[in-house]
């Protein structure tokens, strides 16, 4: 017997927990000093592997005269493990579908960002994501691939360390546009990596909610390699920043009120983490984060504290991991849009601002959310005799949010000057319990089979109660003192059980075939539908510098909570008992919407410095839920859901990453670019149009297409003068006017390194082919007097002679600016310099100045939303009035600008150092 040590080739540190496998499976795991024992006389080939390192195969006999084995860290990008399915993680070369992996392990040291969208938008092919408006804490709108669905639920599933994250937006005391995003609770600096699964071909294993894709977030863990297990790794990161109005308003006669309304929003952030390895293969990670961020809208401010503790234990065949995160937040979300008494509307509509509410009354109001969140998991695994690996994960995400709205006594809002107060209490929780068994079988020379069976139980609960009170007798806002009170309660529970089986074939580490089947049962599907099945299949074949992949999968979207069951509402009591009337007529046969996706792609590596990836996909959605109107003569009101809708979609994703120039480790130029094309078309609606004009779902057109009467020309009086009251003549027919999704979008950028220490980077985003319903300008043009374009036209008309060609031309222009919907469905193409980044590595100087107490230091400066070039005349070409996505029964609306707050320009300076 002979002891051998496994070390990191770059640092010489021992690797704790490296796995040594032979023909019969796992034979050993390295101890706390990196050692394992081997029989030198055994003529077998051993495989030594560890996550993040290139595996190495070596004959046991050759170790007689060798005391160490060096593993190469990150030598082959394809060996980085990414999420292959809900039950497995594999190297990129084994995947038959395109899963994007974003490594953020160095983000804490190199730069600063507050949002998940800043990280992923433009870096992941087939995905577009942005905040619904420019205030702090706003929801994110996701556009995933072709968007071939009629549903308003368009968010992907999000998992954080295996815990199903509750990403429900909260708008209990304000409008949906000003909702509080659940993603605000993510501590960005804690994230180690993100895997993005974009469609059913890869997401089928996640079941009946994964048609929008899945985002897998893995947070940082304790270090596993530490010389002599004495030293902890300590990181401290400090950020100061400011936000300002990025694009000043110039579309109105009086722009000063709007431009002067927005403020400079100051922000500061502190992040620190400690990582430590202990004996007996144990590690610990702790982090603390403080964010204090003010937005450009007065009163918009987010103060958030978070702490995380992670513990890992590895001992031969047994591993244990536990994570606990706590987040406390206090955020003020002043309401600026979508209402008569909101700020931006009152400054936009008239040349004399604040016509409907005094500015002092708006500023006196407050909308505040306090939230507490706990996210935790416990993960266990054990390798049984026979190399059967059992794994179990229990995850919990519990969130309590209290909202308080106040209108102080004495301020006039509408006809109320006696004050108002609303209080909401919301408790959201997600629980998931996963149990998995897997075993690897050696079938023949170079042929292995891994079989996996996984059971997943998920429970999601949402309970909300609120009370709204108004008209207090004095300056005391105790709820009991109000003369008018309204109480609201709601509850929601979703229970899902999924069973997933998977078979994975590996031939010669070149050909990989994966087949899976998921069975789901849920309380949201009809009582006559026992369960739903979702199959998947993928193939990957690797040549030396090229990979071909093909994948097919199916997934779904669950029905609305009331779709499956008939409900009644109590309407009083009679001598014979309660009086009830119908509320919703459910469908006991209702099923989840089903999306099928086939994906083909190829990846190339060119001269080891360039990678190119091409993906083609087609999506086919069936069983989309259409709500058919009920007859009141039958005793019902409203509508009943049926699975009759169909949508087709397809797209292309092209990605490039490369190093154009490198001189040792001193100079380099890395570039990246991606281009996405996507389209969809409704093919069946059950023979009817589903309308929320100007958005419609109509056969032959994109989902949520803009479809409405066009403007034929100006309206004239009998004397030939322009009729300013009528404005224009609308066509009797409807016409297609655009779609809410871009046909082409993507990003490009570079990272330049000079003299080893200096870095310069950029990210540019672009989109072509999308339209926005500019409801802001639509309303101002007909209800106010402040739209500059129309005012200039009216002034020019007054100086022209009736009946002349000049007069008629101006009248034609006025017809195109009149308050008609078709006039304000506008193109929203853009090119945006999203990020400009400068950094300098001060590590050498820091070690010298502190005598190696500080071993790393970096300073960076970043500007986000530097400028945008666009043909959209509104505040910003990336806005969403409904707050992103939401659970909604029936058709909603997409791509509407209803006095959305514009996105700010943000400046941040960051100093980070490690001890």
Per-range role (PLM):
Residues 5-23, 49-53, 63-108, 223-224:
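Short, acidic, small-residue-rich periplasmic hinge/interaction motif at the N-terminus
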């Amino acid at each position: 017997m002979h002891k051998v040590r496994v070390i990191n080739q770059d640092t010489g540190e021992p690797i704790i927990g490296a796995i040594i496998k032979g023909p019969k499976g796992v034979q050993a795991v390295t101890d706390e000093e990196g050692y394992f024992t081997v029989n030198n006389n055994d003529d077998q080939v051993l495989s030594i592997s560890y996550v993040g390192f290139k595996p190495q195969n070596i004959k046991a006999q050759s170790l007689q005269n060798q005391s160490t084995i060096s593993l190469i860290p990150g030598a082959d990008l394809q060996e980085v493990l990414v999420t292959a399915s809900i039950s497995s993680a594999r190297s990129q070369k084994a995947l038959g579908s395109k899963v994007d992996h974003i490594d953020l392990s160095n983000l804490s040291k190199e730069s600063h960002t507050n949002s998940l969208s800043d990280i992923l938008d433009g870096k992941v092919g087939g995905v577009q994501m942005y905040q619904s408006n420019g205030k702090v804490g706003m929801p994110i709108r996701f556009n995933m691939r072709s968007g071939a669905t009629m549903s308003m639920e368009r968010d992907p599933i999000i998992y954080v360390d295996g815990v199903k994250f509750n990403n429900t937006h909260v708008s209990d005391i304000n409008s949906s546009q000003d909702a509080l995003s659940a993603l605000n609770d993510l501590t960005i600096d804690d994230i180690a990596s993100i895997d993005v699964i974009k469609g059913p071909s890869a997401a089928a294993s996640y079941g009946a909610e994964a048609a929008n894709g899945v985002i897998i977030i893995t947070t940082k863990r304790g270090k596993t390699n530490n010389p002599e297990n004495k030293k902890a790794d300590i990181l401290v990161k400090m950020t100061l920043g400011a936000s300002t109005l990025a694009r000043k308003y110039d579309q109105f006669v009086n722009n000063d009120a709007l431009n002067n309304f927005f403020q400079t929003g100051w922000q500061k952030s502190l992040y620190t983490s400690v990582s430590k390895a202990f004996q007996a293969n144990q590690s610990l990670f702790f982090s603390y984060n403080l964010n204090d961020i003010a937005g450009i809208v007065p009163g918009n401010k987010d103060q958030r504290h978070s702490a995380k503790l992670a513990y890992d234990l590895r001992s031969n065949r047994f591993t244990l991991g536990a994570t606990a995160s706590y987040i406390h937040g206090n955020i003020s979300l002043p309401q600026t849009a979508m209402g008569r008494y909101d700020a931006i509307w009152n400054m936009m509509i008239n040349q004399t601002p604040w016509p409907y509410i005094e500015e002092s009354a708006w500023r006196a109001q407050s909308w505040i959310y306090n939230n507490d969140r706990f996210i935790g998991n416990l993960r266990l695994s054990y390798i049984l005799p026979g190399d059967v690996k059992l794994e179990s994960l229990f995850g919990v995400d519990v969130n309590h949010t209290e909202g308080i709205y106040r209108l102080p006594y004495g301020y006039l809002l509408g006809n109320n000057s006696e004050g108002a107060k609303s209080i909401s209490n919301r408790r959201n929780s997600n629980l998931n319990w996963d149990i998995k068994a897997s075993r690897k079988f050696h079938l023949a020379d170079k042929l292995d089979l891994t079989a996996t069976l996984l059971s997943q139980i998920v429970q999601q609960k949402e309970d909300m109660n609120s009370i709204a009170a108004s008209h207090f007798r004095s300056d005391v806002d105790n709820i009991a003192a109000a003369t008018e009170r309204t109480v609201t309660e709601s509850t929601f529970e979703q229970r899902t059980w999924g069973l997933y089986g998977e078979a994975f074939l590996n031939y010669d580490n070149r050909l990989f075939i994966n087949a899976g089947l998921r069975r789901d049962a849920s309380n949201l599907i009809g009582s006559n539908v026992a369960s739903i099945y979702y199959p998947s299949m993928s193939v990957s074949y690797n040549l030396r510098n090229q990979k071909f992949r093909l994948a097919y999968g199916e997934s779904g979207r669950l029905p609305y909570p009331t779709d499956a069951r008939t409900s009644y509402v109590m309407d009083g009591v009679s001598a014979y008992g309660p009086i009830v009337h119908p509320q919703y007529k459910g469908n006991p046969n209702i099923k989840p919407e089903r999306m099928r996706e086939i994906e083909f792609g190829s990846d190339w590596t060119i001269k080891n410095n360039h990678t190119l990836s091409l993906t083609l996909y087609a999506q086919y959605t069936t069983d989309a839920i259409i709500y058919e109107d009920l007859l009141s003569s039958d005793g019902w009101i409203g509508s009943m859901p049926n699975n009759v809708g169909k949508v087709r979609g397809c797209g292309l994703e092209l990605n490039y990453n490369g190093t154009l120039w490198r001189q040792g480790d001193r100079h380099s130029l890395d570039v990246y670019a991606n281009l996405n094309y996507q389209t969809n078309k409704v093919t069946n609606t059950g023979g009817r149009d589903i309308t929320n004009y100007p958005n419609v779902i109509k056969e032959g057109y994109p989902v949520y297409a803009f479809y409405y009467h066009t403007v034929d020309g100006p309206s004239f009086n009998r004397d030939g003068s322009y009729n300013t009251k009528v404005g224009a003549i609308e066509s009797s027919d409807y016409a297609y006017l655009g779609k809410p999704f871009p046909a082409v979008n993507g990003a490009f950028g570079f990272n330049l390194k000079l003299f080893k220490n200096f870095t310069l980077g950029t990210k540019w985003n672009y989109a072509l082919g999308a339209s926005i319903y500019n409801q802001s300008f639509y309303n101002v043009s007909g209800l106010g007097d402040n739209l500059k374009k129309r005012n200039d036209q009216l002034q020019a008309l007054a100086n022209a002679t009736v009946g002349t060609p000049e007069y008629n031309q101006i009248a034609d222009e006025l017809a195109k600016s009149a308050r008609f919907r078709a006039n304000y469905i506008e193109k929203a193409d853009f090119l945006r310099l999203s990020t400009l980044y400068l950094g300098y590595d001060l590590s050498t100087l820091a070690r010298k100045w502190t005598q190696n107490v500080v071993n790393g230091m970096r300073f960076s400066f970043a500007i986000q939303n530097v400028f945008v070039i666009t043909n959209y005349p509104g505040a910003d070409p990336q806005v969403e009035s409904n707050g992103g996505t939401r659970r909604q029964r029936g058709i909603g609306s997409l791509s509407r600008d209803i006095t959305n707050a514009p996105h700010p320009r943000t400046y941040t300076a960051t100093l980070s150092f490690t001890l």
